[in-house]
């Protein structure tokens, strides 16, 4: 599994009278570097209480004429991917100019962690490109299926190709979304209770993953009827048993719960223990606790 490491930084909280020049002087970093790292734009007005990220690099490099990211990486014993991760101002591109300061390394590693990000096929490619260097997985949202277990038509070729270019593992998000764009408990119930449809979906899923270059699947069934909890876990296990020998990773997306006995259609069929053991990994959807359309509350239980 490819994982991402942390880096050292100071978070400067803007005080009355602060300027970018003063902040740069205070923390001994070049002003252009501070501007680039925070993606600030003229006229660079600051507001008290605003936070400015001040990276604390261990080793830097000043770009010379004729340099490329590849040549800089080779000269300094690093990789282009590491340069992208250390220099968000590059936006995942190879655009550099003489005199520009690049961070080669940071001293204190905070640890290692796997990062997943969701994307619609319609995502702004500039946003995707600047984000990919920081991801381990890219979950392409989403694909559905019909009552016979056939995968519905979709196109994710570009996202899969870009993910692979940035050494990110693309995942296909399999959902029970209906034609109205809402999760359908009825669709989940039909699938989980018709053996031929389940078997067909699993085989069709294996074919799609292979044909389109995915590294795995994220199974995201929401509002599953409580009486189908065991059948849902069994389905996820069957998917893993079919896909694991081919090297695919199977994720289960879990609704955020405060207890195993939590009531509600979103939660009751999501048995953490059963789904956790059935899948290779789990994605805890804390973003479904407090979100834009919910009552005012915290973003995770």
Regions found by a protein language model. Name each.
Residues 147-154, 230-233, 238-301:
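Substrate-binding surface in catalytic domains of secreted glycosidases
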Residues 6-27, 50-77, 100:
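Primarily a LysM-type cell-wall glycan-binding module
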Residues 19, 33, 68, 79-137, ...:
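Non-catalytic accessory regions flanking glycosidase/transglycosidase catalytic cores in CAZymes
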Residues 107-199:
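Glycan-recognition patch characteristic of GH18 chitinases/ENGases
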Residues 114-116, 137, 169-173, 216-218, ...:
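Structural preference for beta-strand elements that scaffold enzyme active sites
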Residues 40-57, 94-107:
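Short, structured interface segments
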